[in-house]
């Protein structure tokens, strides 16, 4: 593997050997790991270490940090009704749902009927108005289902009602600029030269079963899952329009360094000053749901408030860990057990989605070393 950046603390030398043997068909990848506030791994292959790419649902971790900042600053109460901040949300008997319940994927708003259009996705107010008017696809709180796309407009409208700013504006001012990190929700045009477009040359499935995901039923078999999936063209999310807009749920453009820097800024591991009140992050990262996900049609899924939680299906950390993975293989998480922050980006698309399991041995090794010291 052609490395364009090669720094590994000697204590974590095993990580380098694993990284060098990750799938040879990757267009490019980056990996940055911090332990107790110190960078112990900074690796890149086939892309510049400062290049950025679309990280899809890893964007949700950046948005969750933004909401946690509002919680810590006393501007947002997760146990307040969503309709308290956003009265129109009360339509179709949604008025008693709390912010925490809505943003832990329990509201039944994984899609609208009719579907959101590509144009609406890049107009948060249009998308949020459609979601406020939508009758839930299932009885809220009776089950949960991943609001893969729609949680973006839900978060954005909430932030707008509280601050008067879009979530992208608030994140830029309060989070990204403060962390001085290459992790954008809306990447400026002058930085486009540093963007590595997502490769669509080859689909590489993480479980090796390409035939399975080529079948019509694919990896969404339930009616809810079929209706919730495939609402928006992929080109809408990964094109310049998507990169410029920065949909809070799916259009972040980041480097692995940038991801790790934002998370480290937020948590302040290693005795640093946390940019977000620790109790707010702890509250948002507490597990809210676990089990069968209606929208993904998968078992063993779990979420806090926006943040994804590790399970046996996605074992990226201890029960205290929180973060989010992305459809093309990227991952960002923090684990207070060992004070680990990991950012990983991949510049290619693969199904069935989620973080690239090729880095699971790295996650396991880092956790073992970090918790032993």
Briefly describe each language-model feature range.
Residues 247, 268-271, 285-293, 352-373:
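Short, gly/Ser/Thr-rich active-site loops of penicillin-recognizing serine hydrolases
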Residues 22-32, 46-102, 139-149, 247:
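Short active-site loop at a secondary-structure junction
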Residues 16-49, 78, 118-120, 331-335, ...:
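A short, well-structured edge-of-sheet supersecondary motif
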Residues 105, 151-158, 246, 250-272, ...:
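Active-site-proximal alpha-helical segments within enzyme catalytic domains
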Residues 49, 57-58, 72-114, 133, ...:
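Active-site helix/loop module of the DD-peptidase/beta-lactamase fold
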Residues 49-52, 111-194, 238-254:
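Catalytic-site signature segments of enzymes, centered on catalytic residues
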Residues 13-19, 37, 54-80, 154-160, ...:
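Active-site SXXK
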Residues 198-256, 285-338:
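Active-site Gly/Thr loop motif
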């Amino acid at each position: 593997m052609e490395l364009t950046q090669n720094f590994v603390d000697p204590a974590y030398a095993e990580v380098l050997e694993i990284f060098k043997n990750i799938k040879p068909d990757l267009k490019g990848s980056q990996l940055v790991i911090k332990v107790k506030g110190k960078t112990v791994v900074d690796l890149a292959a086939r892309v510049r270490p400062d290049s950025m790419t679309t990280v899809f649902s890893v964007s949700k971790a950046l948005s969750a940090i933004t909401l946690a900042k509002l919680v810590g600053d006393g501007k947002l109460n997760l146990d307040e009704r969503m309709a308290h901040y956003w009265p129109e949300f009360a339509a179709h008997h949604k008025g008693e749902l709390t912010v925490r319940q809505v943003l832990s994927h329990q509201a039944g708003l994984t899609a609208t009927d009719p579907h959101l259009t590509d144009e609406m996705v890049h107009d948060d107010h249009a998308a949020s108005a459609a979601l406020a008017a939508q009758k839930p696809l299932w009885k809220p709180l009776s089950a949960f289902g991943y609001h893969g796309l729609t949680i973006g407009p839900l978060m954005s409208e909430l932030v707008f009602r509280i601050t008067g700013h879009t979530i992208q504006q608030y994140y830029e001012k309060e989070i990204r600029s403060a962390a001085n990190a290459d992790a954008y929700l809306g990447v400026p045009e002058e930085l486009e030269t540093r963007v590595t477009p997502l490769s669509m040359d080859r689909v590489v499935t993480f479980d090796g079963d390409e035939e399975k995901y080529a079948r019509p039923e694919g990896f969404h078999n339930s009616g809810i899952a079929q209706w919730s999936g495939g609402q928006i063209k992929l080109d809408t999310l990964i094109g310049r329009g998507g990169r410029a807009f920065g949909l809070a749920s799916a259009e972040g453009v980041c480097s692995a360094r940038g991801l790790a820097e934002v998370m480290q800024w937020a948590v302040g591991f290693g005795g640093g000053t946390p940019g977000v009140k620790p109790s707010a992050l702890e509250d948002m990262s507490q597990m809210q749901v676990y089990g069968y996900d209606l929208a993904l049609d998968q078992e063993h899924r779990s979420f806090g408030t926006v943040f994804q939680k590790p399970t046996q299906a996605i074992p990226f950390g201890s029960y205290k860990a929180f973060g989010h993975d992305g459809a093309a293989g990227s991952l960002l998480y923090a684990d207070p057990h060992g004070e680990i922050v990991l950012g990983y980006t991949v510049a290619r698309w693969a199904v069935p989605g989620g973080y690239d399991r090729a880095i699971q041995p790295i996650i396991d090794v880092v956790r073992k070393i970090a918790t032993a010291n």
